[in-house]
C-alpha cells in the first residue's frame, strides 16, 4: 500500500492557518526573550519587548523593554514608556502619559493632565486638564497653561509662556520672548528679558519693565514702576499717570523728526 506524506513545511503552514482562523475574533500578540516574556492580556493587543505589558480590554499597544499600555486604546512605544491613561500615548524612553487622552513624546516627557500634551526631553504638562508643554524641560503647570520653548515655564492658571527660559507664573499671565517674565496676574511681557510684575501690567520691548499695577512700559529698557503709569520709549522717558504729581515737573517735547522727549518746566521757562 502506497502512502503519500506531505512535506513538513506544508504541515506547519496548515497548522499556522488553523491557529489564525481559530483566533480571528480575539487577536493578541506577545513576543519577548526567553528570560523575560511580554504579556498581552487584552483581546486586541500588541506587545513587543522584554517585560512589556498591555492591559485594558481592547486596542492597546506596548512596544519596548518594560513598556506598558495600561488602559483601552493606550499606546506605549519605547523602553519603560508608560501609557497609563485611557486613550493615552507615550512615545520615548521613560516617557509617561498617565491621564485620559494624555500625549507624551520624548525622553522623560511627562503628560499627567487630562488631554495634556508634552513634547520634548523632560517636558512636563501637568495640571488637571488641557495643558501643553513643547520644548526640552518646558513646563505647563496648571490647567490650560501653554509653555513653548526650551525651559519655558507656564506655571499660572491659563498662562502662556513662549520663548527660551520665558516665565508666566501668575494666573493668565502672558510672556513672549527669551527670558520674558510675566509675574503679575493677567500681565503681559513681550521682548527679550521684558518683565511685567504688576497686576494687569504690560511691558513691550527688550528689557522693558512694568512694575506697577495697570502700568505700561513700551520700548527697549522702558520702565514703568508706579501704579497706572505709562512710559513710552527710553531716552525721553515720556510718562503718564493718574497719580498726583510730585518732585520735578517736566513737559513733553517733540522735534521735527517726531521724536518725543521731556524737559523740566523751569528750564523751558528760562529758555523762552
Which residues make up each language-model segment?
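Detector for intrinsically disordered, low-structure N-terminal pre-sequences
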Residues: 9-12, 28, 76, 80, ...
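Surface-exposed, glycine- and small/polar-enriched segments that build interaction surfaces at terminal
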Residues: 65, 71, 84-86, 93, ...
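Small/polar residue-rich beta-strand/coil "junction" motifs that cap repeat-based extracellular fibers
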Residues: 30-42, 46-55, 59-65, 78, ...
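Short hydrophobic/aromatic beta-strand element in the GNAT-like acyltransferase core
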Residues: 60, 74, 102, 145, ...
